[in-house]
Structure formats: C-alpha cells, structure tokens
C-alpha cells in the first residue's frame, strides 16, 4: 500500500494528529467550539494588525493622524481598522465563554492546560491594553496613565518601576514607541503559548459534557468537528461584520476621537468593556495597594480553581446547586461590568463593593462548600 503523505511527512503528520485524525469525544457540544474560534480570532487580529502597522506611525505627534489617514485614504483602511478594533471585542467574548465552559464542565482539572490558558488570558489582556493606547486619543492617553500608575502602589520599587515603564516622568513618546513594539510582539507570543496549550490538551484529550472518560466512544476530528467549527466560525463572523460595518464605534469611547491632551482630563476615565469587571473590583477598594491586589486577584483566582474542586462529579451537568451558583457568578460579573462603566458616586460605589465581595465569596467559599454538600446529598 502506498504511504499516506499526511501520516508520513514530518510536518504534515503533526497537523494530521492535531487537526485531522485526532480522536475526539462524540458528544462535545457547541461550547467546545470556542477554542477554534479563538484561534481564528488570533489569526484575524494578526492579519488586520499587520496591515494596520504598515500605515501606522508610533510617534505622539503623528499617531492620531496616521490612524485617521488609514481610515480615510488607505484602500479599505476603515474596514481593516474596524475589524481589528471590534475583532478584539469578539476575541474577549470568545475567551470569556471558553473560560465559562471550562468552569462549568470542570475542564480545569486538566491543570497544565488550564494554567497555560490563564497565562494566555493575561497575555491577551496585556496585548489589548497596549493596543488601546496606540491611536493616541484622550482615552488612550489617560487609560495608559491611570493603569501604568497602578504599579506605583508596589512598595519600595513602585515609583521607579512606573518611570522605567514610561521611559520618562509621564506617558510620552517613549511610552508610545514601546507599547507599539509590545503590541506587535505579544500576539506571536500568544500564538506560541497556544501551541503549548494544545500540546497539553492533546496529552489528555478533550473533556465532554458528562465529565466521564470518552475513550470508549471517539470519532475523528475531521470531518465531524472541522465542519462544526466552520459553522461556529460563520455564526461568529456574521455579528462581527454587522458590528464592523453598521456600528463600528458602538463599543468605543467618544473621548478617543479627541487627540491626547495631557492638560485635559476626561470626566470619566474607563477602559474598554472587556476590562470593566476588573476595573470595578479595582475601584471598589478605597486603598491603592489594596485595589491593585484585588485587581490582580480577580484574574489570578482562576489558578486556584482546580484546588477548590471538592465535588465527586467533574461537571456541573448533574449538580443543580452548583449550576445555580455558576449562573449567579455570571450575573455578578455582568453587574461588575455595568458598575465599571458608571461614575464613582452613590449608589454605584456600594453596589460595586457588594458585587466584588460576592465575586470572591462565590469562587473561594461557596463553590467548594456547595460541592461538599452535593457529595453528602449523593448518600441520600
């Protein structure tokens, strides 16, 4: 029999074993589509970003006008920019749903896969943050100033660290230049970590909605899940294109249409929508260092999730109490997102503090407690 090049070629056999002949559980639902959607988001962002970088100038006196020039005079520049800006939003929607799926179905018990995923989330957040500074509008400048300033809360080395990050005594040209360098570099770092993420995943194989071993019933990834992924892809691209073509500035801040001015502070400094939940947690603590620690904890808490799993069952499929708690957490995150977009005044302050407290209570105390309770209920 003639050798199959797909299975014998050194490069093709790697692709084959991870995308074609990969044994996959027969019962994974649409919640398992988001991994491939994230890969597509990353590819789209790298391609549109590369095209934008060809027309961008990382200089404080030229950055704003170079972005405006791209939108006005470059062929389809407006489309490339709108896809890139809104593509970031869809990237975060997909990653939040992907993490939510992992939480619900106990995928975090694959510890290496989960931990590399958390590193990917942190890298993505860093990339989005430095990218938001590049158009050099008012919110770009003040967002950069406020968030980088948080490092000054670190005892002893804080102030030195901030000035080192800025490349001076305020956010200025050196800051913009290095942020552009980082924004160009980090997506490729994300791509590298993604390969590690997949390597760890393929060691164990995918989890499934029942949370039990699926070794007895596996199907090839291609054509079943390649086709399912293409369907998911189409369903994601339709709203992305709708947003980019009909309402491209819906999720942006109007302040960013004004060029950066260090002498005028915008009335409400707030990040893009996907950071609002963390921003609300940061603001809910009246102490600077405390706020920074809470901000870090809000994301890093994901690393503790595998150790807080007390249930005998892996997924929440047959655990109604944990399900209720899970959706309570989702609602809580939506409240935090809303609070992050509101001014710091009554009643938003107290709502934010309650929601922040609930967030940590649900994850650190209630999930393990309810898991243990459900184990007890199995005996009756």
Curated annotation (Swiss-Prot):
GO BP annotations listed: mitochondrial electron transport, ubiquinol to cytochrome c
Positions of transmembrane segments: 34-54, 78-99, 114-134, 179-199, 227-247, 289-309, 321-341, 348-368
CDD domains linked: cytochrome_b_C, Cytochrome_b_N
UniProt-annotated binding residues for a ubiquinone: 202
Pfam family, one: Cytochrome_B
Co-factor(s): heme b
Gene Ontology molecular function terms on file: metal ion binding; ubiquinol-cytochrome-c reductase activity
Subunit details: The cytochrome bc1 complex contains 11 subunits: 3 respiratory subunits (MT-CYB, CYC1 and UQCRFS1), 2 core proteins (UQCRC1 and UQCRC2) and 6 low-molecular weight proteins (UQCRH/QCR6, UQCRB/QCR7, UQCRQ/QCR8, UQCR10/QCR9, UQCR11/QCR10 and a cleavage product of UQCRFS1). This cytochrome bc1 complex then forms a dimer.
Summary of the function given for this chain in its UniProt record: Component of the ubiquinol-cytochrome c reductase complex (complex III or cytochrome b-c1 complex) that is part of the mitochondrial respiratory chain. The b-c1 complex mediates electron transfer from ubiquinol to cytochrome c. Contributes to the generation of a proton gradient across the mitochondrial membrane that is then used for ATP synthesis.
Additional information: Heme 1 (or BL or b562) is low-potential and absorbs at about 562 nm, and heme 2 (or BH or b566) is high-potential and absorbs at about 566 nm.
Protein name: Cytochrome b
Organism: Francolinus francolinus (Black francolin)
Phylogenetic placement of the source organism: Eukaryota, Metazoa, Chordata, Craniata, Vertebrata
Gene that produces this protein: MT-CYB
């Amino acid at each position: 029999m003639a050798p199959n090049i797909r299975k014998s070629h050194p490069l093709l056999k790697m692709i084959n074993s991870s995308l074609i002949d990969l044994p996959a559980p027969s019962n994974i639902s649409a919640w398992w589509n988001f991994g491939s959607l994230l890969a597509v988001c990353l590819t789209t962002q790298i391609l549109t970003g590369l095209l934008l970088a060809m027309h961008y100038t990382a200089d404080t006196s030229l950055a704003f006008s170079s972005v405006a020039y791209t939108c006005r005079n470059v062929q389809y520049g407006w489309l490339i920019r709108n896809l890139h800006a809104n593509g970031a939003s869809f990237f975060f929607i997909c990653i939040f749903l992907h993490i939510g799926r992992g939480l619900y179905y106990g995928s975090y018990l694959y510890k290496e896969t989960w931990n590399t995923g958390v590193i990917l989330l942190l890298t993505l957040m860093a990339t989005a943050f430095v990218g938001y500074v590049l158009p050099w509008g008012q919110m770009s400048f003040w967002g950069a100033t406020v968030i980088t300033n948080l490092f000054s809360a670190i005892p002893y080395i804080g102030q030195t660290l901030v000035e080192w990050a800025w490349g001076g005594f305020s956010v200025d040209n050196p800051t913009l230049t290095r942020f552009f360098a980082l924004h160009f570099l980090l997506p490729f770092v994300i791509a590298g970590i993604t390969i590690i993420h997949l390597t760890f995943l393929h060691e164990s194989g995918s989890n499934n909605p029942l949370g039990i071993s699926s070794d007895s019933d596996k199907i090839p990834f291609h054509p079943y899940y390649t086709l399912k992924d293409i369907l998911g892809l189409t369903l994601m691209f339709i709203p992305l294109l709708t947003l980019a073509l009909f309402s491209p500035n819906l999720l942006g801040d109007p302040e960013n249409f004004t060029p950066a001015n260090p002498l005028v502070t915008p009335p409400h400094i707030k990040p893009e929508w996907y950071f609002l939940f963390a921003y609300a947690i940061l603001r809910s603590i009246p102490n600077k260092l405390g706020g920074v620690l809470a901000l870090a904890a809000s994301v890093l808490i994901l690393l503790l999730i595998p150790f807080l799993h007390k249930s005998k069952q892996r997924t929440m499929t047959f655990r109604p109490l944990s399900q209720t708690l899970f959706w309570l957490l989702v609602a809580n995150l939506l409240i935090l997102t809303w609070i992050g977009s509101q001014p710091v005044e009554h009643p938003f302050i107290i709502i934010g503090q309650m929601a922040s407290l609930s967030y940590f209570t649900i994850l650190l105390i209630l999930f393990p407690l309810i898991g243990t309770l459900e184990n007890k209920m199995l005996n009756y």
